[in-house]
């Protein structure tokens, strides 16, 4: 199985999505999540080299591979890291620090016939995963940042939602 070719196939899917100006961000979520898994490889892939999913995780029930992958994500909150270290019953959330809807909007702004390498550069800049607790996810929801960026977002700070919610990044 050629993992690089699989990674590139998801960039091609995103390219077609952009060219068609399809506003359905659910497809972008699937394509971007899979692109990232094949880009990172290692614990982001299961033993069959398929992308690993991170839904319904509890800190006390993580496999070694899940734990390794979570610890390699772009952002892990102090509370999430503490829960992982203590193997508490805390529910963990894999979160796109810039919501996929916003990433989709950014990608759809690419007019014409974008190259896969340019799409990958945008994903490397804006596709960022966070590990937060269920309670921290509720904080984002309470301040209406569950699926959008803050009104004053500068277009660069990928962790702006977490900053607004007072979610602190752990030091690994």
Predicted regions and their residues:
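Nuclease and nuclease-like effector domains acting on nucleic acids or nucleotide cofactors
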Residues: 1-88, 143-149, 157-170
């Amino acid at each position: 199985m050629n993992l690089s070719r699989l990674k590139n196939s998801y960039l091609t899917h995103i390219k077609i999505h952009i060219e068609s100006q399809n506003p359905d961000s659910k497809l972008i979520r699937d394509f971007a999540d899979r692109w990232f898994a094949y880009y990172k490889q290692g614990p982001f892939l299961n033993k069959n080299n398929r992308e690993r999913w991170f839904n319904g995780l509890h800190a006390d029930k993580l496999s070694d591979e899940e734990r390794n992958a979570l610890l390699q994500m772009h952002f892990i909150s102090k509370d999430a890291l503490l829960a992982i270290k203590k193997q508490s019953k805390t529910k963990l959330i894999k979160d796109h620090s810039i919501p996929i809807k916003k990433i989709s909007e950014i990608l759809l702004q690419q007019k014409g016939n974008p190259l896969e390498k340019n799409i990958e550069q945008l994903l490397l800049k804006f596709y960022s995963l966070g590990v937060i607790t269920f309670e921290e996810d509720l904080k984002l929801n309470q301040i209406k940042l569950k699926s959008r960026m803050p009104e004053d977002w500068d277009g660069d700070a990928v962790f702006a939602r977490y900053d607004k919610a007072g979610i602190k990044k752990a030091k690994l």
